[in-house]
């Protein structure tokens, strides 16, 4: 039977902290300023063990929690994790210990195994797009607004699949739409923040479609908020992927075979195959060289980022 004095929350940050806050609320500990002790970062094992040894004051339970216990992952001290694991049997019955970590825990570590055996472990994988969309709909209801599933999907596409981002964007959109109003797709397109990945996708699409003016306008907007190095890196990744697909197509490989070789799904491979059709393998190789030169020029300050990126992108896309 699980020990309800031991909790481990791991994975996606929003859900981890939500679970911790729900635990704190459910315990309803008296005099929390004395009986609840929280560590934002991981203390050493001795300090944590000492905190756990304390007795509650005028309360049934005492809560000790760590919001970023890195010893549960490959980043933190395995020795500290082992030391705490060996002490769990000696925790007072009045102490509730909750450990949180962002990302997947290292299940090989003794501490994880002990929590899995003795306590309650909850793991939260990164959300999928449909889960983020459903979350957006619920957040809109909390704000007194209405948001359809379809429009929520548009929001996730533009802003990214991240609970914190979606929560903030829905709050902003609810204010923009007005009390009790429905958040429309047009509201989302006008107000929602775009992820860098989405902006790169839009830039790439405009350049593939030979819309030089539209691409230049969007590039100027993106460079107002993003570092140019990040854009260059994502364009380099796009052209590396096109180069790989083009090379395999030239060898006679089919879409399914390419997807298996590159460990990608078939649909992205089909898109890449369509996009690289107008380029030769040699052109794509030369584009990667030009992007490397652009990266150096921007990082070294040799050239103005807007001018250098515009010239390079128009050249490598053949405009």
Annotate each PLM feature.
Residues 1-319:
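Conserved beta/loop motifs at nucleotide-recognition and modification sites
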């Amino acid at each position: 039977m699980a020990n309800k004095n031991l909790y481990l929350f791991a994975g996606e940050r929003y859900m981890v902290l939500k679970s911790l806050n729900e635990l704190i609320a459910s315990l309803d500990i008296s005099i929390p300023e004395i009986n609840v002790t929280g560590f934002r970062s991981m203390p050493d094992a001795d300090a944590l063990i000492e905190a756990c040894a304390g007795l509650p004051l005028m309360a049934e339970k005492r809560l000790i929690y760590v919001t970023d216990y890195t010893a549960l992952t490959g980043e933190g001290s395995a020795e500290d994790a082992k030391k705490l694991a060996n002490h769990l049997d000696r925790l007072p019955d009045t102490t509730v210990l909750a450990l949180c970590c962002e990302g997947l825990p290292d299940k090989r570590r003794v501490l994880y195994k002990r929590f899995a055996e003795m306590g309650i472990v909850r793991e939260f994988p990164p959300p999928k797009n449909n889960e983020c969309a459903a979350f957006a709909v619920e957040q809109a209801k909390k704000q007194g607004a209405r948001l359809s599933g379809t429009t929520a999907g548009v929001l996730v596409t533009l802003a990214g699949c991240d609970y914190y981002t979606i929560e903030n964007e829905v709050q902003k959109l609810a204010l923009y739409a007005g009390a009790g109003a429905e958040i429309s797709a047009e509201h989302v397109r006008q107000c929602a923040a775009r992820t860098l990945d989405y902006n790169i996708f839009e830039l790439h699409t405009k350049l593939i479609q030979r819309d030089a003016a539209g691409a230049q306008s969007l590039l100027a907007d993106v460079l107002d908020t993003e570092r140019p190095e990040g854009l260059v890196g994502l364009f380099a990744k796009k052209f590396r992927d096109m180069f790989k697909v083009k090379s395999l197509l030239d060898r006679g490989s089919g879409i399914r075979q390419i997807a298996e070789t590159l460990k990608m799904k078939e649909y992205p491979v089909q898109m890449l195959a369509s996009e690289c059709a107008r380029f030769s393998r040699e052109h794509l190789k030369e584009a990667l060289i030009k992007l490397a030169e652009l990266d150096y020029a921007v990082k070294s300050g040799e050239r103005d980022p807007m001018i250098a990126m515009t010239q390079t992108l128009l050249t490598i896309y053949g405009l």
